[in-house]
């Protein structure tokens, strides 16, 4: 006798009605917490600085370009093909490379650069996270291989948290092969819990938030 037959026998003996299927209640919808732009900037800054990252706010694209120039201090940098970097004229800086004849030259430049410069598709305020969607404009190598990473991001791309990101990108697979979330500099620890930065990626990260 299977389980349902046994239970039916018990119900009949007790004079009870047949069991009715009970539908599961719908999952509760938790709305995204909304805060002001200034609150998001403050939250993002605090979260990233807690992870040894750095946040610089710029009032214009021109100021952002000059800030990048100052951070580079004549050292070599490689920039992604993000259209926002071009709009900020960062790819026009004399010590920033952004165009290469082939993939081999591109990889070599990434390995030799002191800085990798990207934008970001989004930034998450509550964790100080950059969201990088791989594609024609953004390459993972620029944000991964150089020892220092500079991300230039317009404030309008600053979201509250991961929940809001999922609402913006409900099906990431439709757009790209990967989506990378970068939270602070690369860090790792051995069995003795000795923390080391920069082993598996950039040991320094600076995010320049630009007012739209």
What does each model-found stretch correspond to?
Residues 1-212:
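The feature marks the mature, well-folded catalytic cores of soluble enzymes
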